[in-house]
Amino acid sequence: MEMREAYIERQTKETRIRVKLNLDGAGTAQVDTGIGFFDHMLEALARFGYLDLEVAAEGDLQVDPHHTIEDCGLVFGQAIREALGERRGIERVGDTLLPMDEALVQVALDLSNRPYLVWDVECPEGMVGGFPVEMAEEFFRAVSVQAGITLHIRLFSGKNRHHILEAIFKGFGRALGLALRENPRFQGVLSTKGVL
């Protein structure tokens, strides 16, 4: 199979985001978004998905972290889409149940080229290390739309914001890694239509 890599850069009046992605990596990450907790989450996502990920983001953090977080999701999603190519010879779907202390999260996804997010997460409002809790949903919506992923995220239990968010990011990485696995038993796309 060909190299599944991408480099995407996006610049607006609010942000400048650069993402380099290797879907067949070892889980290494170099992330600098200016939001320490968000960096930690993206590093965890990469580690649990065995992705090599580089993210460099400059944003209007003096205003709010919203633009930086959402735009990172947009560019990361675009990088996934580009690196996937025609989505041939992969498992396509991935599902994981991931615990972190009292938090238990399920993430199920389909690299279907049909973007859709179901966010069934009741997380205590507030901030974690400069990261507004509600921005996790916006990040994953942006990833889903840009990458063409049907994505379901469900929280079964949890009280600690940090634990809940970390379980979500790790769970997404794990489910994505499973969906990206190559399957030598077929060469085309896993679809009765023959295309995604």
Curated annotation (Swiss-Prot):
Q: What class of enzyme is it?
A: lyase
- Reaction(s) the record says it catalyses: D-erythro-1-(imidazol-4-yl)glycerol 3-phosphate = 3-(imidazol-4-yl)-2-oxopropyl phosphate + H2O
Q: Which SUPFAM superfamilies match?
A: Ribosomal protein S5 domain 2-like (SSF54211)
Record's Gene3D superfamilies? Imidazole glycerol phosphate dehydratase, domain 1 (3.30.230.40)
EC code: 4.2.1.19
Mind listing the GO molecular function terms for this protein? imidazoleglycerol-phosphate dehydratase activity
Q: What is this protein called?
A: Imidazoleglycerol-phosphate dehydratase
User: In which organism is this protein found?
Assistant: Desulfitobacterium hafniense (strain Y51)
